[in-house]
Amino acid sequence: MKRERIRRRVAALDTSNQIALFGQAPASIPEARPGADSPRKQAPRFEEPDPRLIRINEQRLDQLLEQVGQHAPLKIRAWLGQMCFSEFEQAYPPGGRPAYAPRAMLGVILCGIMQGISSLRELERFARTDLGCWWVSGAIMPDHSILGRFIQRHGGLLSEQFFDQLTHKVLKLTGSGTGVVAGDGTVIEAAASRYRQMRAEALAQALQAAREAAQGEAEAGARVEQLQRAQSILDSRREEREARGKDASGLSINAREPEAVVQPQKDKQRYAASYKPSVLANDKRVIVAAQVHASSETAVVEQLLDQAQGQGKIDTALFDAGYFATDVIVATAKRHIELLCPEGQSQGSDWNKHSDKRLPKSGFDYHAEEDCYRCPAGQRLSAVGCYKGNASAPAYTEYATRACAGCALRERCTRSAQGRRIKRYAIDAHKDALRAKMAQPQARQRYAQRQAMVEPVFSTLRHRQGLQRFRRNGLAAVRVEFALHAMAYNLSRALAQLFARFINGLLTHGHPSLRKVAALLSHAVVAMSLQRGSTLCSAALHAR
């Protein structure tokens, strides 16, 4: 049987514009004009849903929040909408899948912290279940890893530029400034187990064991690097302590969190690896500056003052007796800021409370015209020598007397066979002037407002925002975490001030029946949390 031939269509190709492999190329190829048909540079895209499109039972979400008296989320979203996030957006590359908008991400984090939620997994659950958070963020639902990467990527902005921007906004909302600020600090435990604290001997043994097990194992090698870093930090701390003439044999460190210092906690009953955050607050209890140091509250005073002066001029700074130090006096004098700070552990009417076991240096009166000291027993201490000082130790003049042998106060004054000796430094003239100022009734009265300005700040951070312990490792990460808590606290203060203004309006211009209600609310709000106060503020604004 003869097969039929299959006929296929043959396509004719136009080869007139083609060039042979070894043929002669055209003399020139026309260049495209720059920018004519070139693709434009893509800007990063962000996912920021409109919460006005969210409906629950055919009712808009904002209407539902107003109906139940939850106006705080409405206010927070409006305030965040007035902030600038361009620096955040510049950190994202163009193209690809749209990222969650920085405004929405920060709304989730701050709203959660205001309600005492700071764990990343708890924030993930909060973003999925809280209606107020839906309105602030547009109902985005990031998981804990996305939240963690956002904080890590923008840590520098969150703790510096954006903190200053939000603080400026809150100062305008509260109608307050930085004329008078009060400073304080506390100690907060680090994210490290107290059972992993090691002294120098145990650390050396652990490092030796890790080195023996590190042959060919990447994880063991990382452990060696961690222990080496901890040993280096511990050695530097021991050298610094010995240079000051103190015993360093009892120093310990946590290898998992070596930047944290093992120090006594607030209850004075235990030691743990921890950090010391410090703040400056104004008369409306708004945090105008926040810093964190590993072990010192006075070491960050200069940074606090500079950060606060970025918001406005500081006239007076109030610090407790723990800040009666050279660094603080010099920092305030250099910036022409009036300092009110007592010496010793001032409590009640006793402004210079010291231990009865030893007479302090402040109990000796210096007489500049005679260049001598007078001790509490009336004896004269004359200059017996001078020290010129060096790069590590300041110069001083030493004063002494031979009348200590038969003095009735010797047991309380000195145990030295040579008698009591007083060293006078250049800074002592400023300390004497500060003591004289704090002895005046007007200065005491002005200083008395410090406790109400700054003491409630850390109480709120600990008990209302859940800052009993840091969750991130390393000093840099801890600073970012504390800045987030400070920003959430400031938003709560702005909401509380709105509530206070509404109550004052009712007390001044309201109907007599409304005045009674306002009086009851003003007494009740003292015992309420800021979260509850924000809700009352929302209800008050709605009623108005």
PLM feature spans:
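Short N-terminal secondary-structure initiator segments
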Residues: 23-44, 72-91, 222-232
